Curated annotation (Swiss-Prot):
GO molecular function: ATP binding; glycerol kinase activity
Organism (species): Xenopus laevis (African clawed frog)
Protein name as it appears in the record: Glycerol kinase 5
EC class of the enzyme, as a word: transferase
PANTHER family associated with the record: GLYCEROL KINASE 5-RELATED, SUGAR KINASE
Signal peptide: none
Chief location bin: cytoplasm
Gene name tied to this protein: gk5
Length: 479
C-alpha cells in the first residue's frame, strides 16, 4: 500500500537509534530521505548514588512502540520494510540466563560509576604495573602495537570490563550461571537481537564489541588475555559479525511481518558512517548526552597515551575501518541538569540567554558529573561552578555551561591533533546539542576550523540505515 501522505510505494529501511536520552526510529527511502518517524524519551533509572540503569522490559516496550509508530507515521505496512538497522549506545550491558532468557539485572549504563573503586584499585595495582612492564618489553622486542597498547592500558568506569567484574563479584546468580556455561552477556544491540529473534540469535558486531574494552581490536576477537586477567569467562560473550550483515528475521508476532535485521552498529560509529567520514583524517564531533570526537585512521589502529580509544568503526566484508576516539560524558547531561534547576524554561532559550551577557562574568563550569575523561582521565572529578559572585545571573550560569561544552570540545580536538599526527581533512558535527549555534560557533572559533553540520542531525540513525541498506541496495554511492 502507498502512503496517502507521501505516495511511497517502494520498500523502506527502518533505523532505530537507542541513545542515552532518547530512543528514535526513522524510516528512510533509497535516497536517504525520512518518510516516517517516532521517538520516546529513554527511561533511565538512578537507584542510588553513582548507579545508572535501564529496565530491560521498559526498553523493549519502548523499542517495539517507536517502530510501530514510525511505520504508522509513514503510512505504510510493515511488509513494505526491506530491513532494519539498529544503532545503540555503547558499553551499556546486561546478562541473562541462556536457557530461560531471564535477565539477572537491569542494563548497567556506560555512565554508571559503581565500579569506580575497582577501577582505582586496578589502576594502582602491582599486577597491572607488572603487565605494563612485561608488555613494554614485548613491544621493544617485537614492535607490535598491541603490546604497546597493553603497556599503556588503564581502566575507566566507561569500559564494560570492570563493571562486568563488579557484576560477577556482587550478583551470585551471574557468577554461578557463568561457571555452568549458562550465562549470556550482551550490549543493547545483542539483547535486542535476542528479543527480536525470540532467543534464536546471539550475536553482536565489531563496532559494538570494540567499544566494550573486552575486545582485542588488534586480533579482532574477544581478549582471552584480559578475560584471564580479570577472571571473566569467555563463554559468556556473543559471536562477532560484520556490521552490515543478515542477522536474522524479527519474529512476525512482534511487528506483524518478518522484518530482516541487516545491521547492528554502535552509535558513534553509526554517526561516523552517516556523516560519510570515509577518508583518513575525517573527523566527526557528536554532541548529545556526551561529546564524542572520532577520527578515521583507516586500516591502522591508533595506540594512545592520553586516553583516546582505538575502535573498529565498521567491518563490511573485507573492509575494516578503524577510528580513534575521545569523549566527554556530560555535555547534554549538564544542560539537562540546568533545565531541572529551572535556570531556563526551554533548551531553545539557552542560546539567547548566553548572548544576552557580554561574557561569562568570570564563571566557569567543570562539566564532570561522571568524572573527566580524555585527556584528564579522572573518574573522581566532580562538577563545579567557579567564580560565583553576588552579581552572577542565570544568564551567566547558562553561558558558562554552554562554554564548558566548547572548552571540552577544544580539549578533545587538541588531544586528537597531538596524538594521531594525521592531517585533518574535514570536521562534521551532529547530535542534538549541535543545534545550539552558540556552542557551534565557539567550538569553531576555538578550533580555528570550519565545522560542517547537516540539517538532519540524527546521524546515528542514518548510519544504521545506510549499513542496513547496503544489504538491500548494494554498496553506498558517495559521489
Amino acid at each position: 500500500m502507498s502512503s496517502p501522505r507521501n505516495g511511497y510505494r517502494d520498500r523502506l529501511i527502518l533505523a532505530v537509534d537507542v541513545g542515552s536520552s532518547v530512543l528514535r526510529c526513522h524510516l528512510y527511502n533509497q535516497s536517504g530521505e525520512i518518510c516516517g518517524s517516532a521517538e520516546d524519551k529513554l527511561k533511565v533509572l538512578y537507584p542510588q548514588a553513582g548507579y545508572v540503569e535501564i529496565d530491560p522490559e521498559s526498553l523493549w516496550e519502548q523499542f517495539v512502540r517507536v517502530v510501530k509508530e514510525a511505520v504508522a507515521d509513514a503510512g505504510i505496512q510493515m511488509s513494505q520494510v526491506a530491513g532494519l538497522g539498529i544503532s545503540t549506545q555503547r558499553g551499556t550491558f546486561i546478562t541473562w540466563n541462556k536457557k530461560t532468557g531471564e535477565t539477572f539485572h537491569n542494563f548497567i549504563s556506560w555512565q554508571d560509576l559503581r565500579a569506580a573503586d575497582l577501577v582505582s584499585s586496578w589502576n594502582r595495582s602491582l599486577l597491572l604495573k607488572a603487565v605494563h612492564g612485561v608488555c613494554t618489553a614485548l613491544h621493544f622486542f617485537t614492535r607490535r602495537k598491541r603490546f604497546l597498547a597493553a603497556s599503556l592500558i588503564n581502566f575507566t568506569t566507561q569500559h564494560v570490563s570492570l563493571r562486568l567484574v563488579w557484576v560477577l563479584q556482587n550478583i551470585p546468580q551471574v557468577r554461578q550461571a557463568a561457571e555452568k556455561g549458562n550465562c549470556c552477556f550482551g550490549t543493547i544491540d545483542t539483547w535486542l537481537l535476542h528479543k527480536l529473534t525470540k532467543g534464536t540469535v546471539f550475536a553482536t558486531d565489531y563496532s559494538n564489541a570494540s567499544g566494550t574494552a573486552v575486545f582485542d581490536p588488534y586480533l579482532m576477537c574477544w581478549s582471552s588475555f584480559l578475560c584471564s586477567l580479570l577472571s571473566i569467562p569467555l563463554s559468556i560473550f556473543p559471536p562477532v559479525e560484520d556490521t552490515s550483515h543478515s542477522f536474522g528475521l524479527a519474529d512476525p508476532t512482534i511487528f506483524g511481518a518478518p522484518v530482516p535485521i541487516l545491521a547492528l552498529v554502535a552509535d558513534q560509529q553509526a554517526a561516523m558512517f552517516g556523516q560519510c567520514c570515509f577518508d583518513v583524517g575525517s573527523v566527526k564531533l557528536t554532541m548529545g548526552t556526551g561529546s564524542f570526537i572520532s577520527i578515521n585512521t583507516g586500516e591502522t589502529l591508533h595506540t594512545s597515551i592520553a586516553g583516546l580509544y582505538p575502535l573498529i568503526g565498521w567491518k563490511v566484508g573485507d573492509e575494516v575501518v578503524c577510528l580513534a576516539e575521545g569523549n566527554a560524558s556530560d555535555t547534554g547531561t549538564a544542560i539537562k541538569w540546568a533545565e531541572e534547576l529551572n535556570l531556563f524554561t526551554s533548551v531553545a532559550d539557552t542560546e539567547a540567554m548566553a548572548r544576552s551577557v557580554p561574557d561569562c562574568g568570570g564563571i566557569y563550569l567543570v562539566p564532570s558529573f561522571s568524572g573527566l575523561q580524555a585527556p584528564i582521565n579522572d573518574p573522581y572529578a566532580c562538577a563545579s561552578f567557579m567564580g560565583l559572585k553576588p552579581s552572577t545571573s542565570k544568564s551567566h550560569l547558562v553561558r558558562a555551561i554552554l562554554e564548558s561544552v566548547a572548552y571540552r570540545n577544544k580539549q578533545l580536538y587538541d588531544t586528537v591533533l597531538r596524538e594521531t599526527t594525521i592531517p585533518i581533512t574535514l570536521i562534521r558535527a551532529d547530535g542534538g546539542v549541535s543545534n545550539n549555534n552558540f556552542i557551534m560557533q565557539m567550538t569553531a572559533d576555538l578550533l580555528g576550523q570550519t565545522i560542517d553540520k547537516p540539517k538532519h542531525t540524527d546521524m546515528s540513525s542514518l548510519g544504521a540505515a545506510f549499513l542496513a541498506g547496503m544489504a538491500v541496495y548494494g554498496p553506498l554511492k558517495t559521489s
